[in-house]
């Protein structure tokens, strides 16, 4: 700020904001004033002509007093608005700023008075006798005897101009403080200000290194105004320079916190390693520190980004054997999200609703012991045979539950996976906690559950096959689980092969080739996506005699056009 007071009130920023508000309000108050005058005139016309009384044949005598009150109110509002407009127009808030501040504040030349920095500095800086505690020492060098109240600050003219290179300093003689002081972030902060020579100044022209403690408090006033009541804070006029300045000072503060005794010496300044010096120049400094081996990080050697990159490259190599279009991998995340959504909305949500409906029917029929999630799979299969006419969907539901003896966990986990729309609780290599007990390998993983319900759903969509009387046409033809192994030598084998149980890993077998996508949380989804993509591109969208497109299962929409 370019004011001469110690604590200006209001500040330059506040006055600038107020001036902008006045400029914006000038047009608004004028409009309101004209509106109030118009309303008052209309009411006065009605009072004199009695238009309402004549037109509506109203003789209510308080009406005139109501109109008088409204006319008076609008008139007073109009007078107040015109007074504000006159005040903002005739006597607006004016500012005295430097050209740099005018540019930063975005002020128009018509509303400010621009004063050259030299004149402003000349009106603020007055010579004063030097303090004995700083006589004969560097202006910005550290002195243990210096009291906190005498810490030097930048003058208002210190920051009026910046240069990309350090201004030269005179090495001899005495100098007087110049209002054209320049600051350079390239100097490494070992030199900060330039002084013009004059025999009247008691201060040396050399400037020592900047201390790293109390950094921001030490760069605020000229050397001739440590305790002067006219010294004033200033703002840097360039954001890039300010950022560079603060970053370098924070680096120096960090060196001080490390406990280095030479942190304030020129050798440990930010430019210490920028000079062309030999190793011998650092011998005295380096021998003070003991060489220690760094602790080995507990994190894995390859971070997540590197693992993802390797996984993506491996996936590209596998997909390149299926299609030459390498841009497909750019859509893989979108395909995976759509596929998860399809499984949730098409299989899991309807399955949970049907299970709850069947359980309700069982209770109404007086069979509470056959509640799904409590009864065993064997009991449910027998009930499906006996009560098939009453509950025809029970047999289809039992096929989805024929995965693990722990029916309660399976049902609860399917309910959890059906929530959220996109299986947000899915965990590829484990499952959910059950009755306060953490998941263990005696329970199926989420990948196993999703693969089972997916295969069972397609079993229900494919027509019956005489070779598979149990109705598991898709599962028997297109899914193989270890310890069983597919016949890779058979060209007609087209299946998903689960080669590992914990953690689960899936591979695709197609035309005597094994396509093994990268392991991890998306292995199952990506393998199934490749399975469906081959059906779409190489099998014309047909899985046997069933169309997986719009006219059939309607799952190939996830690939778009």
Swiss-Prot record:
Principal location listed in the UniProt entry: membrane
Keyword tRNA processing: no
Source species, domain of life: Eukaryota
Transmembrane domains' residue ranges: 28-48, 60-80
Keyword Transcription recorded: no
Pfam families tied to this protein: CytochromB561_N
Chain spans, region Disordered: 120-156, 196-233, 250-270
Record: glycosylation sites: 57, 274
Bias (Low complexity) ranges: 138-152, 260-270
Entry membrane topology: Multi-pass membrane protein
Compartments it resides in: Membrane; Nucleus envelope; Golgi apparatus; Cytoplasm
Entry-annotated residues carrying Phosphoserine: 9, 11, 98, 201, 248, 278
Any single Gene Ontology cellular-component annotation: nuclear envelope
InterPro entries attached to this UniProt entry: Cytochrome_B561-rel (IPR019176)
Keywords, alphabetical: Cytoplasm, Glycoprotein, Golgi apparatus, Membrane, Nucleus, Phosphoprotein, Transmembrane, Transmembrane helix
Subunit structure: Interacts with NUP205.
Entry function: Nuclear envelope protein which in association with NUP205, may be involved in nuclear transport of various nuclear proteins in addition to MYC.
Name of protein: Transmembrane protein 209
Lineage: Eukaryota, Metazoa, Chordata, Craniata, Vertebrata
């Amino acid at each position: 700020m370019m004011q001469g007071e110690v604590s200006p009130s209001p500040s330059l920023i506040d006055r600038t904001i107020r001036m902008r508000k006045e400029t914006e309000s000038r047009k608004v108050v004028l409009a309101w004033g004209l509106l109030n005058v118009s309303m008052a005139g209309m009411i006065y016309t009605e009072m004199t002509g009695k238009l309402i009384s004549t037109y509506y044949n109203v003789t209510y005598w308080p009406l005139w007093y109501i109109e008088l009150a409204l006319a008076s109110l609008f008139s007073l509002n109009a007078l107040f608005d015109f007074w504000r407009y006159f005040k903002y127009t005739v006597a607006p808030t004016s500012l005295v700023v430097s050209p740099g501040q005018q540019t930063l504040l975005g002020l128009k030349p018509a509303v400010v008075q621009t004063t050259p920095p030299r004149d402003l500095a000349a009106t603020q800086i007055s010579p004063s006798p030097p303090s004995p505690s700083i006589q004969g020492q560097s202006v910005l060098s550290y002195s243990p005897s210096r009291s906190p109240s005498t810490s030097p600050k930048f003058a208002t003219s210190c920051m009026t101009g910046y240069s990309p290179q350090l201004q030269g300093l005179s090495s001899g003689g005495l100098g007087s403080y110049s209002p054209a002081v320049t600051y350079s972030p390239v100097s490494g902060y070992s030199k900060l200000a330039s002084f013009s020579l004059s025999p009247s100044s008691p201060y040396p022209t050399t400037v020592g290194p900047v201390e790293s403690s109390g950094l921001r408090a030490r760069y605020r006033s000229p050397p001739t105004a440590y305790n002067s009541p006219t010294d004033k804070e200033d703002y840097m006029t360039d954001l890039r320079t300010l950022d560079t300045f603060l970053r370098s000072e924070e680096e120096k503060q960090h060196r001080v916190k490390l406990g280095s005794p030479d942190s304030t010496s020129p050798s440990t300044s930010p430019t210490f390693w920028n000079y062309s010096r030999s190793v011998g120049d650092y011998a005295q400094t380096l021998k003070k520190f003991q060489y220690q081996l760094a602790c080995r990080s507990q994190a894995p050697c390859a971070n997540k980004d590197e693992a993802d990159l390797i996984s993506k490259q491996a996936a590209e190599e596998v997909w390149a054997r299926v299609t030459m279009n390498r841009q497909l991998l750019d859509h893989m995340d979108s395909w995976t999200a759509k596929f998860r959504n399809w499984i949730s909305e098409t299989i899991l949500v309807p399955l949970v609703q049907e299970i709850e409906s069947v359980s309700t029917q069982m209770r109404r029929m007086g069979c509470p012991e056959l509640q799904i999630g409590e009864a065993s799979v064997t009991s449910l299969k027998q009930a499906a045979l006996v009560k098939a006419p009453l509950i025809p969907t029970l047999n289809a539901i039992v096929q989805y539950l024929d995965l693990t003896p722990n029916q309660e966990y399976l049902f609860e986990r399917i309910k959890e996976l059906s929530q959220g729309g996109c299986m947000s609780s899915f965990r590829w290599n484990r499952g959910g906690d059950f009755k306060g007990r953490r998941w263990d390998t005696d329970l199926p993983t989420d990948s196993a559950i999703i693969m089972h319900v997916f295969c069972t759903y397609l079993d229900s969509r494919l027509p019956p096959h005489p070779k598979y009387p149990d109705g598991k046409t898709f599962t028997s033809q297109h899914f193989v689980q270890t310890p069983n192994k597919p016949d890779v030598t058979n060209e007609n084998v087209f299946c998903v092969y689960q080669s590992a149980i914990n953690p689960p890993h899936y591979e695709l077998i197609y035309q005597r080739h094994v396509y093994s996508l990268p392991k991890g949380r998306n292995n199952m989804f990506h393998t199934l996506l490749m399975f469906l993509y081959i059906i779409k591109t190489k099998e014309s969208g047909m899985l046997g005699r069933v169309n997986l497109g719009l006219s059939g299962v309607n799952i190939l929409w996830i690939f778009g056009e």
